UniProtKB/Swiss-Prot annotation:
Region feature (S2 domain): 762-860
Species for this entry: Clostridium perfringens (strain 13 / Type A)
Chain segments carrying region S3a collagen-binding domain: 865-979
Protein name, entry field: Collagenase ColA
Comment field on protein domains: The mature protein has 4 domains; a metalloprotease domain (S1, approximately residues 87-761), S2 (762-860, equivalent to PKD), and 2 collagen-binding domains S3a (865-979) and S3b (992-1104). The metalloprotease S1 domain is composed of 3 subdomains which together resemble a saddle; an activator domain (residues 93-367), the catalytic peptidase subdomain (377-646) and a helper subdomain (654-767).
Positions of Ca(2+) 6 binding: E995, N997, D1020, K1022, D1023
GO MF annotation, one: zinc ion binding
Described purpose of this protein according to its UniProt entry: Clostridial collagenases are among the most efficient degraders of eukaryotic collagen known; saprophytes use collagen as a carbon source while pathogens additionally digest collagen to aid in host colonization. Has both tripeptidylcarboxypeptidase on Gly-X-Y and endopeptidase activities; the endopeptidase cuts within the triple helix region of collagen while tripeptidylcarboxypeptidase successively digests the exposed ends, thus clostridial collagenases can digest large sections of collagen.
Amino acid sequence: MKKNLKRGELTKLKLVERWSATFTLAAFILFNSSFKVLAADKKVENSNNGQITREINADQISKTELNNEVATDNNRPLGPSIAPSRARNNKIYTFDELNRMNYSDLVELIKTISYENVPDLFNFNDGSYTFFSNRDRVQAIIYGLEDSGRTYTADDDKGIPTLVEFLRAGYYLGFYNKQLSYLNTPQLKNECLPAMKAIQYNSNFRLGTKAQDGVVEALGRLIGNASADPEVINNCIYVLSDFKDNIDKYGSNYSKGNAVFNLMKGIDYYTNSVIYNTKGYDAKNTEFYNRIDPYMERLESLCTIGDKLNNDNAWLVNNALYYTGRMGKFREDPSISQRALERAMKEYPYLSYQYIEAANDLDLNFGGKNSSGNDIDFNKIKADAREKYLPKTYTFDDGKFVVKAGDKVTEEKIKRLYWASKEVKAQFMRVVQNDKALEEGNPDDILTVVIYNSPEEYKLNRIINGFSTDNGGIYIENIGTFFTYERTPEESIYTLEELFRHEFTHYLQGRYVVPGMWGQGEFYQEGVLTWYEEGTAEFFAGSTRTDGIKPRKSVTQGLAYDRNNRMSLYGVLHAKYGSWDFYNYGFALSNYMYNNNMGMFNKMTNYIKNNDVSGYKDYIASMSSDYGLNDKYQDYMDSLLNNIDNLDVPLVSDEYVNGHEAKDINEITNDIKEVSNIKDLSSNVEKSQFFTTYDMRGTYVGGRSQGEENDWKDMNSKLNDILKELSKKSWNGYKTVTAYFVNHKVDGNGNYVYDVVFHGMNTDTNTDVHVNKEPKAVIKSDSSVIVEEEINFDGTESKDEDGEIKAYEWDFGDGEKSNEAKATHKYNKTGEYEVKLTVTDNNGGINTESKKIKVVEDKPVEVINESEPNNDFEKANQIAKSNMLVKGTLSEEDYSDKYYFDVAKKGNVKITLNNLNSVGITWTLYKEGDLNNYVLYATGNDGTVLKGEKTLEPGRYYLSVYTYDNQSGTYTVNVKGNLKNEVKETAKDAIKEVENNNDFDKAMKVDSNSKIVGTLSNDDLKDIYSIDIQNPSDLNIVVENLDNIKMNWLLYSADDLSNYVDYANADGNKLSNTCKLNPGKYYLCVYQFENSGTGNYIVNLQNK
């Protein structure tokens, strides 16, 4: 079973339990859903000239933001995710120094410094614990903030930004460290409200000077990390109005735009986080409901600014649209916000970014409907957007290589990328020694390359295709598709071709070297391939046609001249995502091995191809501890830097795109034989949109074998010479020929033997070409399906009269696609979808058929909440029924929830986890008796929904839901299958409770030594039992919660029904206590709270 993840760069996350090495990010709120990106363009990442693009995952701006800020090597924040540096002095302060200061001096000092003056500010250690565990000290900072709030001026911010950062550091440390958990309480955070209001009621609270803008920004950050009330939120309207009224002047001012953005972001995060801690997750149950309309009016007004929209302010309008959609639920009449989004769709041009953003927000927050209840048909909007922004399609290699591009991406550029792929592939195959796909039938049988016109248009890919755009390009392995964009030198230090070469290498890695999909298997559990995948991708991007693989100047210049500032060999081999450095140093290591130790390169590559994880780890460990090898690696980098002026960036030559005269294919074959002495040469012709190409494969017999590594070097050199000799011939088409060799053997004479493959331009006009008849697509499937249920689509009855079907492309109408002949799909939302099947024949002919599919709702049979503690298998909550929805929450302290269910008979079991906050959550499933090896994990991931299914044998299974990135999040989990609610052995001789026993005067009488099976529900919240005690006794009461509902028990004396005499001690699902009782009548009240659904329990009474 393959895992639907993507191979990537900046943000690959390991699906491991929380206690594994935690991944951190160097950029602020970098990704959506748990998607991973690759080959992020270093210059593009910082090319916005201070502008902040829309943050896709706005739910992560609080503790996550702080975590990201301290993720860099020097423990200092990066980018716009932290307050601007004050830089008033360069002195570094330790917590030991700060802890020795009195409160007054401390606060005054904080006002004069930057967060950068305290490098350990966000680190938990003895000093920070001592500092923040002192409640009076924290209170002094809050009072200091309030005082500064009253006294700051237009020219002096009185240290407000740094005071805020100190408080944010405390909240961060309190969230992730239980020793400081008091800082994470609403009570303490609410103590900031007077300070916030002091800031707002200061007459200087507005946009204006740099100091004023900084104060507004700091307030937004504080709101997001601390607290707010309707008054604080509504007090922000003047800032939003001022920005709107002066948008011509303020739109291009970074500090003002950033200040407004942080206000919107902080308010959105805090108010939505309150919902997740509110009964029923309902905005109506919060203090903000129907009380922040003034703020909403100003926010909504920023959604439509008419002809004042320009490149400087568009990003802020995009954010206003996004936050309007998310916060409309706080209005008594949400349709007001809904209409604001509708107005945006009417005001902005069809398929402009703002139009699509507004439509997306209606789809996400209002069920895809306008205020009149009509469907906006967002799927059609996305389809039209793809048609507008990607109107061109180019096919190569009989349809196995497809490019979809913007209208400004030139045909010449497309052709160059195709030929660049051949140069990279040829050198890649030489090194890895494999040209057969590890698994046939994967989506990457057809590679699709999507190229937008520009970075701006590329941002739409997040909406219309659902993938992160905070990168220079992204390869999604489970759909065999690579997304990127054309760029100018001002926008990127890399050309499109350079980036394409890097990404194309990831495609080759996934198809020919690394077994399974990205993220699947043991290789990915600890991130041991991180350096290999990214370092060799940078390396192979330097592939040439005839001169092997060259070190690229654009990457070499990123190496440090001072060895003390470089990554060591150990550091490279154990690199994790979070910084850019290991790309450069992994590139240098790959170049070192290629030029000085191919045996080492081959050995680690073979471990990967053979899926030998332990062998690979052992080999990496031995390399890491080899100090002599590290010295050679460092020496090699010295040589690269000393020669940097002579380096360049390999790109394809103009010969590929120049015209080529016609030449008989037989002449080409004979010429290749002549210069190479290749035997048994066979050829295969493939058609592309602009030209025809050939692959010729034959056998080369070399000299006496000197061992595989030496044979490889000899063959590599000889093949380069063969290509150069061929290029000397008069026909210029030979300058398009690339070649590789694989399958080393030694013949009976002791000579080495390789299979050699040539690829080049075929201009033979006599090559058989006929008029192709279009194939016919045929769809076989059901016409309706339940939401989240699997539906099967069969395209195998599609036909082609004069050939065969070579490719299938399903478009399921919800943005998802498949390239399989027989596909399965699940819809996440109800509605009617138009499914399209496009088939391509062996001659490039295309035909499309469509069919309507109706998706209907499937409501869970019951909704319950998890019962803590359930962090261990022995304390697991039971999931008693199929299609029961369980609500749970994870955090730094509560990082794992365990559940169990019993499978009654062999059959398919489906598990669906909805990640409500888009944080780092996943799940694994274990069989009772082997809790160390999982039997199933989340194989489907669209960013918020983690799915998996498998045919399971009867028995008990344990489900582990856990967080892997130190973020708090709420989730729901649903299990469907043949489940049974197994009554435990201890309950088989129990009596059944008899209703109605909901009041003391209707209590069910039971013996003081008895077992009772009872049931609670939302309509039956309590059961009462009467017990007569004849003698002084120790009554042991154990109530076992069978179905994980929220329940408890209290014991009352008949003499006082207002005050209980004893209560339960909770231990997982067991509620127990031993009560010392005098003779008399007692009432045991077993009750449910929070309306957590229907559940069974067992009462066990033992009178000692």
